[in-house]
Amino acid sequence: MELFDKVKALTEIQATSGFEGSVRDYLKTRMIALGYQPEFDGLGGIFVTKTSKVANAPRIMIAAHMDEVGFMVSSIKADGTFRVVPLGWNPLVVSGQRFTLFTRTGKKIPVVTGGLPPHLLRGTGVTPQIPAISDIVFDGAFENAAEAAEFGIAQGDVIIPETETILSANGKILFLKLGTIVTVV
């Protein structure tokens, strides 16, 4: 597997704060393939120890986090849309984006956020602003709350951005999972 393919595989795993199991499983598989025996802490962290062949070698730790921004469903409105609370938060990445809603039963449901594009506000006297969390509407195209419930959607389900890793002219900007990439590539 080429380096870019490894980076792409890891960065496209959807995992928000408190729901990093899919990344942890990937790392476990990769670490075992590299000959390490992964261990886990009580908070969901994963680590390995590599013993040096050199006596009295310095100890080095590479630490990384596995999560990314996301949301948790706090309510389902009568019209079938959702309101959320943040799990990590960057308001600039929300409006008009695609997300995946993960139900407690394991279903993955595509959802989008609504937003009014700034160019439609020109001439209205309204200045575009960063949305408040309470104003963000997540829509899975359900007719109503009952239909959303039929699909297994409930309070406490998580919503994570759906992203694609691309190789741009100058390379992808990596922040959240850079340390994690270093540990397994």
Where are these predicted regions, by residue range?
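N-terminal hydrophobic/helix-forming segments and targeting peptides
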Residues: 1-185
